[in-house]
């Protein structure tokens, strides 16, 4: 039958590779339209073409438990059991992120603990977004590094129960794995080393002689607190700079401003002056008034002639 595992396939974790998927989900995959139309007669070479057509990641969805194409291709790879080199090329493929995700899931299902850590941990540096279809049939966004973290730490991914994975520190103690160094730690080490080099360069530089002279001059001069007048001038200086050239007019306009006062104010001042002069020198004022009212000799002659004519 078309749903049987190939004859030369090796057992994985002591069982048939297809049995890594639960029976209910496996039967749903066999009955799906995608399995019958797209996965029939596929080989290891043709699976690559189908994997390149994937648009999202997911397990089953809906009330009828419909499988996604991603899960169907996973079961097909468990059925035909491609070579390890092909799976490694799937994982190292940087052009198609869904091909990489498919290879990572297959490696997690069939590979040893050492192979899983060796080939999947470098994918932590892949921050590309992938679409994931949940059980309700809705799509969500996820990054590739999140998907890899789920494969290494969770028990179920894409509705498939993952085999038990040995802890990493156990493999490190038995020297089967080297301690993991993340890319972030490497970047931090590079930054720290560059900062230390810059500090050493700054310490090695001698200050310029002008800087020394300036320091000696500052030490010789006694420090004084600025006078209030100096403070005012400094505080007013930016205002003066900001004034327009029209406001910087010289003193003559100010004099014109004093001259152009109201006539009423000028008259009041003249009256005050007259009043003061009256109070200080009354005799002088009277003589002045008498002089102003005394008739001139020509006027006296005219008045005398008029009086004669009247008498005549």
From Swiss-Prot:
Annotated spans, N-terminal protein interaction domain: 1-179
Chain positions covered by the region annotation Disordered: 180-312
Record field: compositional bias (Basic and acidic residues): 202-223
Subcellular location: Nucleus
Biased composition (Basic residues): 224-294, 301-312
Domain of life assignment: Eukaryota
GO term, biological process aspect, one: mRNA splicing, via spliceosome
Major localization listed first in the record, in broad terms: nucleus
Cross-referenced InterPro entries: PRP38 (IPR005037)
Biased composition (Acidic residues): 184-201
Role summary: Involved in pre-mRNA splicing as a component of the spliceosome.
Subunit structure: Component of the spliceosome B complex.
Protein name: Pre-mRNA-splicing factor 38A
Lineage: Eukaryota, Metazoa, Chordata, Craniata, Vertebrata
């Amino acid at each position: 039958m078309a749903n049987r595992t190939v004859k030369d396939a090796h057992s994985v974790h002591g069982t048939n590779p297809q049995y890594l998927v639960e029976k209910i989900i496996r039967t749903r995959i066999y009955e799906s339209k995608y399995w019958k139309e797209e996965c029939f007669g596929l080989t290891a070479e043709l699976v690559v073409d189908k994997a390149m057509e994937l648009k999202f990641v997911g397990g089953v969805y809906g009330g009828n438990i419909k499988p996604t194409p991603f899960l169907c291709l996973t079961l097909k790879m468990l059925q035909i059991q491609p070579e390890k080199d092909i799976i490694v090329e799937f994982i190292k493929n940087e052009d198609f992120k869904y091909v990489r995700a498919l290879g990572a899931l297959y490696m997690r299902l069939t590979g040893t603990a050492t192979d899983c850590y060796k080939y999947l941990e470098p994918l932590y540096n892949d921050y590309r977004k992938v679409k994931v279809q949940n059980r309700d049939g809705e799509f969500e966004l996820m990054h590739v590094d999140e998907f890899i973290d789920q494969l290494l730490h969770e028990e179920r991914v894409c509705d498939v129960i993952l085999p038990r994975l040995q802890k990493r520190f156990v493999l490190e103690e038995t020297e089967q794995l080297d301690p993991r160094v993340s890319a972030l730690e490497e970047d931090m080490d590079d930054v720290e080393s560059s900062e230390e080099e810059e500090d050493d360069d700054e310490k090695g530089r001698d200050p310029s002689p002008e800087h020394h002279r300036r320091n000696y001059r500052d030490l010789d001069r006694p420090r004084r607190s600025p006078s209030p007048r100096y403070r005012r001038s400094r505080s007013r200086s930016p205002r003066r700079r900001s004034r327009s050239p029209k406001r910087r007019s010289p003193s003559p306009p100010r004099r014109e401003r004093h001259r152009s006062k109201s006539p009423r104010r000028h008259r009041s001042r003249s009256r005050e002056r007259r009043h003061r002069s009256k109070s200080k020198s009354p005799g002088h004022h009277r003589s002045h008034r008498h002089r102003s009212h005394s008739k001139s000799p020509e006027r006296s002659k005219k008045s005398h002639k008029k009086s004669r004519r009247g008498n005549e």
